[in-house]
Amino acid sequence: MTDILKETGTQEYKAFLTGDNNFRYKVFPEYKANRLKNARPIHLKACNEHLVNNWNAVVTDGCEADDLLGIEQTALSHEVDASCIASIDKDLLTIPGKHYNFVKKQWTLVSPQDALHSFYTSLLTGDAADGIKGALGIGPKKSQVILAGCETEQEYYNACLNFFSCEDELIQNARCLYIWRKENDSWNPPS
């Protein structure tokens, strides 16, 4: 944490940890089912306790840490350089704003259009780590061909819809992949 604060040039931060309760399990009961419980790092509990006790990390209830990061970044988006998400998780690139990958020591500025493109790319390709399959036979290269030329959310949605067995499957995947921008947010198809 000290290194991240130094590298990002700030002393102000909010840290979030994912708790046990997560709405995504209600949306998709197989969410993260492919992760073995005993495959978690042996010192994870001690690390989380350290972050809570020494760095004032907040443990989420009902959502993931990613969602609280998305809410904070969105709330501060009107102020230039007011917020930055420090994470190695590519899923967070669906949130507009500044991002810092503290392992690669890399800054990324994600525009609203970049965030939309990243979300729909994830929708097509799925997220193996979370057990979300995506559209059958669609990988990163095919997804870029499918999404080429899309500008509006409606265009992205329509482009993706053709590659799912039904609209309900697309909606279920999208609701699991979508990172909140406000409290108790939910993804809905564009209308």
Where in this protein do the model-derived segments appear?
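Domain-level signal for Mg2+-assisted phosphodiester chemistry and nucleotide/NA-binding surfaces
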Residues: M1-H50
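Extended two-metal-dependent nuclease catalytic cores across DNA- and RNA-processing enzymes
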Residues: T10, N34-P190
